[in-house]
Amino acid sequence: MITEREIYLTNPEEKRKVIEFLETFQLTFTGNIDYTMGLYDDDELIGTGSLGGRVMRDIAIKLSYQGRGLTRRIIRNLQIESYRRGVT
């Protein structure tokens, strides 16, 4: 089952995992991030997205999971978190 959860970038191990995941897509972690979430299949990170102010950033889905509507889940999670933070 695929689950969503916040990734705490203050944890060096969690941050390293996000950076390495993004690098597999030739994406560079942008920094200046207020919130990051991950999609997990069991404990495997299969997707991620972040908020930096009003901007959604660093959105990626593992290739073998693409085409399943998971980007929509990431965007929706980021929208909800943005509204929760009062950023519209």
Language-model features, listed with the residues they occupy:
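Short amphipathic alpha-helix that is part of the acyltransferase structural core
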Residues: 1-28
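Small side chains
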Residues: 4, 38, 47-49, 79-82
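Short secondary-structure boundary/capping segments
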Residues: 28-29, 48
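Short, small/polar residue-rich loop motifs at catalytic or cofactor-binding pockets
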Residues: 31-33
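Conserved beta-strand in the GNAT
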Residues: 38, 44-60
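Extended, structured, electrostatic nucleic-acid-contact surfaces
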Residues: 63-64
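Conserved acetyl-CoA-binding loop-helix of GNAT-fold acetyltransferases
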Residues: 67-80
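Conserved GNAT acetyl-CoA-binding A-motif
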Residues: 82-88
